[in-house]
């Protein structure tokens, strides 16, 4: 029972870090990055589908993204979705591909994006701590029900705390790295 509770908590914490990593990838830095388009979806034959599944996305230059749809008839829909997104970029359509020039970020915009990154990092930390709290409740229930001894539960709690600190440190590192990317001119 203890091993199950720890494994379940660790799996959920890993997922929280993975979500934080995806969130950080969607925050635009001054450089072109295919990940910035991962959350943009279009209506593809009645289904909301991410652009990343409908087109190849390449970065030929530091500030240029080239998007080549697998189906030419999706070109306009992809262009419109990018234009309507919150990325602050203006795509140009040449009939076969979409070019997206990534503009230089202003100092004010950089600060806003750093705040956004810190906020997403804090959400991920809270998520990890909530997972820890639920796992601790499960461990206390196991001890109360007599399914495991005091020493086993105490050891499991230490392991859980160690895992929690490890995952929080990973999230902190993601935020720090993103902050460095954003403030780099």
Curated annotation (Swiss-Prot):
Region (Disordered): 143-163
Organismal lineage: Bacteria, Bacillati, Actinomycetota, Actinomycetes, Mycobacteriales
Gene Ontology molecular function: ribosomal large subunit binding
Origin: domain of life: Bacteria
UniProt subcellular location: Cytoplasm
CDD domains the record matches: RRF (cd00520)
Keywords from the UniProt entry: Cytoplasm, Protein biosynthesis
Function: Responsible for the release of ribosomes from messenger RNA at the termination of protein biosynthesis. May increase the efficiency of translation by recycling ribosomes from one round of translation to another.
Family named by the database record: Belongs to the RRF family.
Protein name: Ribosome-recycling factor
One Pfam family it belongs to: RRF
Main location: cytoplasm
Cited Gene3D superfamilies: 3.30.1360.40, Ribosome-recycling factor (1.10.132.20)
Gene for this chain: frr
This protein's record includes keyword Transferase: no
GO CC, alphabetical: cytoplasm
Any Gene Ontology biological process: translational termination
Cytoplasm in keyword set: yes
């Amino acid at each position: 029972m203890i091993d199950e509770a720890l494994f379940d908590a660790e799996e959920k914490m890993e997922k929280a870090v993975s979500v934080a990593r995806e969130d950080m990838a969607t925050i635009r830095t001054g450089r072109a990055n295919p990940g910035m388009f991962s959350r943009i979806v279009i209506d593809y034959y009645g289904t909301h589908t991410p652009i990343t599944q409908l087109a190849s996305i390449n970065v030929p230059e530091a500030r240029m993204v080239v998007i080549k749809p697998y189906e030419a008839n999706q070109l306009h829909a992809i262009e419109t979705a990018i234009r309507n997104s919150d990325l602050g970029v203006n795509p140009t359509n040449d009939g076969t591909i979409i070019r997206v020039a990534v503009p230089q970020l202003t100092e004010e915009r950089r600060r806003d994006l750093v705040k956004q990154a810190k906020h997403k990092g804090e959400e991920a930390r809270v998520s990890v701590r909530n997972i820890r709290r639920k796992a601790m409740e499960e461990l206390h229930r196991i001890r109360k029900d007599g399914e495991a001894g005091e020493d086993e539960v105490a050891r499991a709690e230490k392991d859980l705390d160690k895992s929690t600190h490890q995952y929080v440190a990973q999230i902190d590192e993601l935020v720090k790295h993103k902050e460095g990317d954003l403030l780099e001119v």
